[in-house]
């Protein structure tokens, strides 16, 4: 009987430890993390608008492309998965469009290729803006870091000709994998850093 009680107690303590690892964030911590994730997403959206704009020079776009890559885990290069340690080919992004009023996922591209294609789009002007407020799912702990999913709504508009006539436009709902990882540097010391991950398309509408 004592042996059974001891085993039960050990299992209970194990469960409490797991729960403590998952729920060791205060409401203030969670809100601070969500605020920081929102800031990083806004930075990414701003970078995209510069890269898509035909008013920006190639030199300026090179700077903003580098800035955009720094927001992502691996910075567009292959990286080790934080969960299983396996080598990943780099952050991937789904792209989509609407055809006959229906959402179609065109394919999945590496982040670097997506940014290069955005720069080279054959429009006289491209506008990428935030169509709605972002949403961030529950933040949960995985090993020594935290993860979450951010949902954004992005409006795309492509214009042609000197009269700047809109040729194409859509609003896409996207889910972004988010990593909140511990980092240490000489300036900030030990701190939490937000990195974005793979981006998938949920839906695209006109």
Description of each model-found segment:
Residues 40, 63-64, 112, 174-176:
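Well-ordered, non-membrane alpha-helical segments in soluble/globular domains
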Residues 20-66:
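Short, low-complexity N-terminal intrinsically disordered segments enriched in polar/charged residues
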Residues 127-206:
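Exposed beta-sheet edge and beta->alpha loop/turn motif
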Residues 1-27:
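Bacterial Sec-dependent N-terminal signal peptides
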Residues 66-80, 177-183:
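A short, hydrophobic secondary-structure junction motif
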Residues 46, 50-66, 70, 128-134, ...:
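Short glycine-rich, low-complexity/disordered patches
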Residues 71, 75-139:
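A solvent-exposed, acidic/Ser-Thr-rich amphipathic alpha-helical stretch
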């Amino acid at each position: 009987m004592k042996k059974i009680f001891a085993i039960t107690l050990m299992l209970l303590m194990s469960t409490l430890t797991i729960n403590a690892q998952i729920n060791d964030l205060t409401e203030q911590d969670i809100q601070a993390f969500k605020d920081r994730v929102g800031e990083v997403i806004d930075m990414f959206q701003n970078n995209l608008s510069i890269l898509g704009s035909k008013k920006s020079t190639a030199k300026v776009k090179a700077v903003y492309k580098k800035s955009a890559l720094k927001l992502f885990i691996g910075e567009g290069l292959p990286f080790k998965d934080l969960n299983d340690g396996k080598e990943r080919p780099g952050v991937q992004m789904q792209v989509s469009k609407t055809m006959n009023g229906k959402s179609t996922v065109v394919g999945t591209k590496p982040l670097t290729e997506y940014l290069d294609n955005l720069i080279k789009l054959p429009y006289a002007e491209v506008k990428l803006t935030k169509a709605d407020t972002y949403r961030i799912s529950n933040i949960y702990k995985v090993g020594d870091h935290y993860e979450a999913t951010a949902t954004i709504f992005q409006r795309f508009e492509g214009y042609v000709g000197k009269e700047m006539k809109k040729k194409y436009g859509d609003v896409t709902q996207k889910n972004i994998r988010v990593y909140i990882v511990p980092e240490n540097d000489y300036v900030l010391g030990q701190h939490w850093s937000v990195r974005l991950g793979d981006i998938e398309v949920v839906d695209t509408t006109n």
